[in-house]
């Protein structure tokens, strides 16, 4: 599919009359003085727009870069541009379109390019596939957009660029704040004696958290970076907790709440007894015990078996205790001759030798032979 690069430049400069001087300076971050754009220049513009969070402009430059890559028939570059489209759609919260573009990217990448990008692409595909249920977009992108669609999208994108650059109306600010709150997700897991809830909110300070824990209730409010409030109310809890022993910790990427069960060994099937009582300001819980707006798979994890295994491992002796335990087990299950051999060799050598063969031991005297680098001392 061919493209007249002069049309691209003309369309860009037709919009200059709509921009104020300040906006024109911002816009110049994504244009060049030459009469046409190259693929590299579109990719640079994409990077600039993504750093300033302008997803419509990101999609515009990714689409034009893809057309130029198609013209060159460079499959590796085509795959890379498709991944840029996928990222742009992801920023626009059009997750189904994003997944399709990442699929195009995987199809076009060469083997060596695929190896380099596989982890990132697989990671993004996992995220967007899990968010497809939240996708309200009716747009399903073609593998390569046509010129009229690009022109229309480009103008719409630039108008969006203007709207994002200018001060948003008061109602739009409230809408954006609500959308940021919608991105907060949480999940939970449990052991036989505790229940852990992770709320994935970044850079939360202690003074930004309001927490109430009672035996049947958990209420938490978190002030987010943009000033909006995320709240979670669990009432009544599935089982009673011990508030005075429960706690929370702040990390750079999450708030971690640890609830101590009043009755251990009871497996919680949910956080609350009735889903109708689970009040969250931005989402409801699903059957997988994860937030409906979550970005990753979150299932309630039953750590009971792992916790018991960990307890067993902690109880297992190590070092000298392990050696003494081995000696006791051998001695307990041995016959009389073996026991005599063990006692004679162990005591005569001051614990540096152990033999179970009485025929060899009965006429032998054992010397103290400490490990290399150590010396025996008399007391």
UniProtKB/Swiss-Prot annotation:
GO terms for molecular function: protein-folding chaperone binding. CDD domains: p23_CS_SGT1_like. Residues 345-379 are annotated as: Disordered. SUPFAM superfamilies: HSP20-like chaperones. InterPro entries: CS_dom (IPR007052), HSP20-like_chaperone (IPR008978), SGS_dom (IPR007699), Sgt1-like (IPR044563). Residues 346-358 have a biased composition (Polar residues). PROSITE patterns: CS, SGS. One of its GO terms (biological process) is protein folding. GO terms for cellular component: cytoplasm; cytosol; nucleus. Residues 292-379 form the SGS domain. Involved in cyclic AMP (cAMP) pathway, possibly by participating in the assembly or the conformational activation of specific multiprotein complexes. This is Glucose-insensitive transcription protein 7. It comes from Schizosaccharomyces pombe (strain 972 / ATCC 24843).
């Amino acid at each position: 599919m061919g493209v007249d690069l002069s049309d691209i430049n003309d369309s860009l400069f037709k919009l200059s009359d709509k921009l104020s001087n300040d906006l024109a300076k911002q816009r110049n971050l994504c244009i060049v003085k030459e009469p046409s754009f190259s693929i590299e220049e579109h990719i640079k513009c994409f990077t600039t727009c993504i750093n300033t969070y302008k997803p419509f402009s990101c999609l515009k430059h990714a689409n034009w870069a893809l057309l130029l890559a198609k013209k060159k028939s460079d499959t590796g570059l085509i795959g890379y541009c498709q991944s840029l489209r996928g990222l742009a759609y992801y920023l626009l919260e059009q997750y189904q379109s994003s997944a399709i573009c990442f699929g195009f990217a995987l199809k076009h990448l060469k083997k060596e390019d695929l190896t380099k990008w596989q982890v990132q692409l697989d990671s993004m595909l996992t995220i967007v596939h899990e968010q497809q249920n939240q996708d309200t977009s009716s747009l399903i992108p073609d593998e390569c957009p046509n010129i009229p669609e690009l022109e229309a999208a480009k103008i719409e994108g630039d108008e969006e660029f203007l709207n994002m650059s200018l001060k948003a109306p008061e109602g739009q600010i409230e809408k954006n704040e609500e959308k940021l709150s919608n991105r907060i997700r949480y999940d939970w897991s449990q052991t036989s004696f505790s229940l852990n809830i992770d709320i994935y909110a970044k850079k939360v300070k202690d003074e930004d958290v309001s927490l109430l824990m009672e035996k049947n209730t958990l209420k938490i409010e978190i002030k987010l970076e943009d000033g909006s409030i995320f709240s979670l109310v669990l009432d009544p809890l599935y089982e009673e907790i011990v508030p005075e022993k429960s706690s929370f910790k702040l990390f750079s990427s999450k708030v971690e709440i640890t609830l101590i069960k009043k009755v251990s060994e009871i497996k919680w099937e949910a956080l609350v007894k009735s889903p109708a009582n689970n009040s969250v300001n931005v989402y409801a819980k699903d059957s997988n015990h994860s937030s409906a707006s979550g970005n990753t798979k979150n299932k309630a994890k039953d750590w009971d078996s792992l916790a018991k295994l960990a307890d067993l491992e902690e109880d297992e002796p190590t070092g000298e205790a392990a050696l003494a335990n081995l000696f006791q087990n051998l001695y307990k299950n041995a016959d009389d001759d073996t026991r005599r051999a063990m006692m004679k060799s162990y005591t005569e050598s001051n614990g540096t030798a152990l033999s179970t063969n009485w025929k060899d031991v009965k006429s032998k005297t054992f010397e103290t032979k400490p490990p290399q680098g150590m010396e025996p001392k008399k007391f």
